């Protein structure tokens, strides 16, 4: 397609200097959105994390016409979107169909390392889901789409209330990746579950995961399940979650139960 849209944002696929990007603009010129995009782009230029992609704010870059024929220049964002990467769910579907446990285990390590960095850096992505987690050929993990991102800001009165916004999502996704690393056939069942489809929702499978983790002696999974079971859309206890994810990144415990029969 020539373009796609989500909410009030429209995106065009472009190639610039041999690299693939998404060029994004807002359907509504709102000063608050423009300022937010500018701040995010400036902040990401400073931190340069391997878990993020290039994100550039370009002022007055695109000439647009309204339905009356009047023209004007608007600001846009240029976000790197390498065509050799795959969204998390597509990557997992292929790896699970091939039964490639080693690649899934490597992905789990990379994903947990990304999640630990995100939590400890006090950065809030704001929209973590499978389609916004891109996987490279070497299993490295890259977050994309930063329109809802919040930077660490001590002067923002609402920052404390949103700083834990990503925790439920990264915990659910880590749990799902760990499950299919043990049983790749389980992905066909878990893909439609909240764990992958809408990871902000508490999955009804958590009690089953607790039993599996307890039986296998997998302490990181059990700890994450306990934290998710006590959460209500927001999982507090950032340091505890970061530590559990750090341990999970190197955990090789087989969950030992065929999840496809549950």
Where are the model-predicted features located?
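Protein kinase glycine-rich loop
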Residues: 2-6
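ATP-binding glycine-rich loop module of kinase domains
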Residues: 7-58, 262
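Conserved structural core of kinase catalytic domains
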Residues: 53-106
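Catalytic-loop of the protein kinase fold
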Residues: 115-136
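Activation of the activation-loop gatekeeper triad in protein kinase-fold domains
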Residues: 145-150
């Amino acid at each position: 397609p020539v373009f796609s849209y989500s909410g009030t944002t429209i995106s065009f696929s472009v190639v610039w200097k041999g690299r693939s990007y998404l060029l994004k603009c807002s359907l509504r010129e709102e000063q608050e959105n423009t300022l937010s995009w500018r701040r995010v782009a400036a902040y990401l230029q400073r931190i340069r994390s391997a878990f993020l992609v290039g994100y550039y704010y370009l002022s007055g870059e695109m000439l647009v016409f309204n339905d009356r024929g009047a023209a004007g220049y608007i600001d846009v964002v240029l976000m790197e979107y390498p065509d050799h990467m795959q969204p998390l769910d597509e990557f997992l579907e292929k790896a699970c169909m091939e039964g490639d446990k080693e690649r899934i285990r490597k992905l789990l390590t990379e994903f947990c390392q990304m999640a630990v960095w995100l939590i400890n850096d006090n950065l809030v992505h704001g929209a973590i889901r499978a389609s916004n987690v891109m996987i490279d050929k070497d299993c490295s993990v890259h977050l994309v789409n930063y329109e809802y991102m919040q930077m660490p800001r001590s002067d923002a009165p609402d920052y404390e209330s949103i700083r834990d916004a990503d925790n439920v999502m990264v915990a659910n996704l880590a749990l799902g990746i760990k499950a299919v690393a043990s049983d790749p056939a389980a992905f066909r069942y878990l893909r439609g579950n909240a764990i992958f489809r809408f990871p902000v929702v508490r999955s009804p499978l958590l009690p089953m995961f607790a039993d599996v983790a307890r039986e296998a002696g997998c302490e990181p999974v059990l700890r994450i399940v306990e934290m998710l079971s006590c959460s209500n859309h927001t999982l507090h206890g950032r340091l505890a979650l970061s530590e559990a994810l750090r341990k999970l990144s190197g955990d090789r415990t087989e969950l030992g139960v065929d999840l496809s029969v549950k």
